[in-house]
Design a protein with these regions (language model features):
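Extended alpha-helical interface modules used as scaffolds for assembling large macromolecular complexes
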Residues: 43, 48-186
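Conserved AAA+ ATPase small/helical "lid" subdomain
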Residues: 14-59
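Short linear sequence elements within intrinsically disordered, low-complexity coil regions
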Residues: 5, 37, 65-66
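Single conserved hydrophobic/aromatic residue that forms the stacking wall/gate
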Residues: 1-10
Length: 186
C-alpha cells in the first residue's frame, strides 16, 4: 500500500482476517481501533490477532506500564483528574497541552503532564490541535476503556465506578425486559 492507501489497507487487512475467521469486524473495530497516525487509523495488532484467533473480544492489552504507575498519574493532585477521566470514559475528548511535559516522569506537576504521560504510555490517544503543542486526548477503544475501569477499581473511585456498574446492570436488565428493576432504578 502506498501512503494514501495505508488507512484503507490496514482496515482491509483487519476486515480480511475477520472474514477468514468469521469474526465481527465492527466489534473488532470497537475494541481495538482508535489510535491515529495522521489520517491513518491504527488497530492494536496483537489484540486483533488474539481476538480473531480466540473468537473472544476482550482485554489483550500488553501493559506498557504497571497499573500502579497509571493509577499514580490518575491520582495526581489528590484525584483532580477524576472529572477529566470521567469525561473521557463517557466518550468525550479533552483538551491537553502536551508541550509542557519535559519527558521526566519525576516532574509530573499538572493535569496536562499527567495526561501526556498517559498518552506516551498508550493509555490515551491524541489528536493534534490547531496550535502547536495543544490537542485533544481520548480513550481510544473498549480495550483501553477496560484498563481505565481496572484502574478505577484499584483506586477505589466509587463515585465513578458505581455509576458505571449501575449503568451496565441497567442495560443488561433492559435487554432482559426486567421492567421492575428498571422502574426501581430510575
Amino acid at each position: 500500500c502506498d501512503r494514501r492507501q495505508r488507512q484503507m489497507c490496514i482496515r482491509d487487512r483487519v476486515k480480511d482476517l475477520c472474514k477468514k475467521y468469521n469474526r465481527d469486524f465492527n466489534k473488532i473495530s470497537q475494541w481495538y481501533n482508535g489510535y491515529k497516525l495522521g489520517n491513518v487509523s491504527i488497530y492494536n495488532p496483537k489484540s486483533v490477532v488474539e481476538a480473531v484467533l480466540s473468537g473472544e473480544y476482550g482485554d489483550y492489552w500488553t501493559k506498557t506500564s504497571a497499573i500502579e504507575a497509571v493509577t499514580n498519574y490518575m491520582n495526581y493532585d489528590h484525584g483532580a483528574l477524576k472529572g477529566i477521566i470521567t469525561k473521557m470514559l463517557s466518550g468525550d475528548k479533552v483538551s491537553v497541552n502536551v508541550s509542557r511535559f519535559s519527558n521526566d516522569l519525576t516532574k509530573v506537576n499538572s493535569a496536562d503532564s499527567a495526561l501526556t504521560v498517559l498518552i506516551h504510555l498508550g493509555y490515551l490517544a491524541f489528536i493534534k490541535g490547531e496550535e502547536l503543542g495543544f490537542g485533544y486526548c481520548y480513550i481510544p477503544n473498549y480495550e483501553i476503556r477496560q484498563e481505565f475501569v481496572n484502574a478505577i477499581l484499584e483506586l477505589d473511585w466509587k463515585e465513578i465506578y458505581n455509576p458505571i456498574s449501575n449503568s451496565k446492570k441497567l442495560y443488561e436488565e433492559t435487554l432482559k425486559g426486567n421492567v421492575e428493576f428498571i422502574n426501581k432504578t430510575l
